[in-house]
Swiss-Prot record:
GO terms for cellular component: cytosol. It comes from the Bacteria. DUMP binds at R21, R172, R173, R214, S215, N216, D217, N225, H255, V256, Y257. This is Thymidylate synthase. (6R)-5,10-methylene-5,6,7,8-tetrahydrofolate binds at D217, A322. Its main location: cytoplasm. It catalyses: dUMP + (6R)-5,10-methylene-5,6,7,8-tetrahydrofolate = 7,8-dihydrofolate + dTMP. Its EC number is 2.1.1.45. The lineage of its organism: Bacteria, Pseudomonadati, Pseudomonadota, Betaproteobacteria, Burkholderiales.
Length: 323
């Protein structure tokens, strides 16, 4: 995957040293972008062995709104163990609900975003509209001396994206995100990959994805997040009847940890292999074949439903994760 190596080299050439919360310095480069044509292959790093099963396990956990490191481990992903149980700041957080708890991270926001409306009790039309949209009244409160009603519902952002792809593919607002200011302090780690926008084309029957990541550990996180984003696009395409096409990957703070430099320099010395192909299990219904819309498969997929075909890679390389 030459694009990945080019990004690493750009950070080494143009990045500036910064201190950060982890205590391990980073070479950081503001504003970076990668773009992949998924018809030409899957964006798997080949200059070391990709932890594919772990990355897919994490993605499946997100789709199931997982908030426990134990549940991620059961899916074959151990990357949350340290953040859940070894981060001193999180261990002292009053919102932590015991061992392995992560708080309302990523998938909780994707699938169960807590939405509230505070409306004047006298605004009957507004209240009626909110109730018709699935909100329910949870309290009556006094706000600035006037009676109000508080209404709540959990928003499944990802399901709404799929519904819109099916019903209105020309819509340019088919997106979901995980940055919930009201709950950031309740999370073991605020979301890094935080905004996903789907771009279907009803004429070509192709679907593309733009992913924005506020902060990306290029040594360890980028290969993981590329895998998850591309796999998610393949899955959404399968469930809605579109072929995955362009995957655009934007990074706010692209950085390399100082103790990852030996691993990355070794990768730069290796020649990338051709891109593999992602294969989805026949268990997952293909809307283009069946004509049946089955969005419930968002939470029914298993890690074993995703495999790489023709994946060649160099020897594994490891580096410590900064927490």
């Amino acid at each position: 995957m030459k694009q990945y190596l080019d990004l690493v080299q750009s950070i080494l050439d143009q990045g500036a040293w910064q201190e950060n919360r982890t205590g391990v310095r980073t070479l950081s480069l503001p504003g970076a972008a990668l773009r992949f044509d998924l018809q030409q292959g899957f964006p798997a790093v080949t200059t070391k062995k990709l932890a594919f099963k772990s990355a897919i396990g994490e993605m499946v956990g997100f789709l199931r709104a997982t908030r426990s490191a134990a549940q991620f481990r059961a899916l074959g992903c151990k990357v949350w163990d340290q953040n859940a149980n070894e981060n001193e700041q999180w261990l002292a957080n009053p919102y932590r609900e015991g061992p392995d708890d992560l708080g309302p991270v990523y998938g909780v926001q994707w699938r169960h975003w807590p939405a509230y409306k505070l409306l004047p009790s006298s605004a009957g039309g507004q209240v009626a509209d909110a109730l018709a949209r699935g909100y329910r009244q949870v309290a009556e409160v006094d706000e600035n001396g006037a009676p109000h009603v508080l209404l709540y519902k959990a928003v499944d952002q990802l399901r709404q994206c799929l519904d819109t792809i099916r019903q209105s593919p020309g819509d340019r607002r088919i997106l979901f995100h995980g940055w919930n200011w009201a709950q950031i302090e309740e999370m073991a780690l605020p979301p890094c990959h935080l905004l996903y926008q789907f771009l279907p084309n009803a004429g070509t029957r192709e679907i593309s994805l733009c992913l924005y990541i506020r902060s990306n550990d290029v040594g360890l996180g980028t290969p993981f997040n590329l895998t998850e984003g591309a796999a998610l696009l393949h899955l959404v395409g399968r469930l809605t009847g579109y072929k995955p096409r362009w995957f655009s990957y934007f990074i706010g703070d692209a950085h390399v940890y100082e103790n990852h430099l030996p691993m990355l320099r070794e990768q730069l010395a290796r020649e990338p292999y051709p891109a593999p192909q992602l294969v989805l299990s026949d268990r997952i219904p293909d809307f283009a074949v069946t004509g049946k819309y089955e969005p419930q498969w968002l939470e029914q997929v298993e890690p074993g439903d995703f495999t790489l075909s023709g994946y060649q890679h160099h020897a594994p390389l490891t580096a410590p994760m900064a927490v």
